[in-house]
Regions:
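Acidic/glycine-enriched connector segments
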Residues: 2-11, 18-145
Length: 152
C-alpha cells in the first residue's frame, strides 16, 4: 500500500473481453471503490488494460465519474503471447488493490495470480452463470486462490 496520504489508492480493474454488462460492472465498482475511499480516506486511481469488455467499461466509468485512470496496453507485436501476462504483471506492480470480474478465462486468471504474487489483495467477482453472477470474494494469497479457483 502506498504510504503517502496525498497519493491515490491505485485499483486495477480487469475481466473478460467479452463481458459487456455495463450496469453490473458499474454497480460493483461504485460499491467497492466507495468502500476503498472510505477505508483509506483517499481518492482512487483506476488502472485498466485497454482491452474490450471489462477494461473498456472501467475506462468509461473513470471518464464518467471523473476518476483519474491509467491505461496499460499489452504490446502484442513485441511480446506475442506473453504480452498479456507481462501487462498484467505491470498493472499489479502499480496497484494497491485489484478488482477482477471472473468467469474462468486465462487472462483474468493471470491478472489474479500476478496481483497475488505481488501481495496485492484481489476482489474476485463472478460473472459466471454457472457459479452465480455477482458472488464476491476477497483473496490475499496464492494458496487461497489455488483452492478457490476450483469453485469458479
Amino acid at each position: 500500500m502506498h504510504e503517502d496520504d496525498n497519493k491515490p489508492v491505485f485499483v486495477t480493474v480487469a475481466g473478460p473481453r467479452d463481458y459487456t454488462d455495463n450496469e453490473f460492472v458499474i454497480n460493483i465498482l461504485d460499491g467497492l471503490l466507495s468502500n476503498i475511499v472510505t477505508k483509506h480516506n483517499r481518492r482512487v486511481h483506476i488502472i485498466e488494460g485497454g482491452a474490450s469488455g471489462v477494461d473498456a467499461i472501467a475506462k468509461q466509468y473513470a471518464l464518467q465519474r471523473r476518476v483519474n485512470f491509467t491505461e496499460v496496453k499489452a504490446d502484442w507485436k513485441q511480446y506475442g503471447r506473453s504480452a498479456g501476462p507481462r501487462r498484467n504483471g505491470k498493472m499489479a506492480e502499480m496497484s494497491d488493490y485489484c478488482i477482477v470480474f471472473y468467469k474462468g478465462t486465462k487472462g483474468s486468471a493471470s491478472m489474479i495470480v500476478e496481483a497475488l504474487k505481488k501481495k496485492v489483495p484481489v476482489y474476485v467477482i463472478s460473472v459466471s452463470t454457472r457459479v452465480g453472477v455477482g458472488k464476491k470474494i476477497m483473496i490475499s494469497n496464492l494458496e487461497d486462490w489455488e483452492y478457490i479457483k476450483e469453485c469458479f
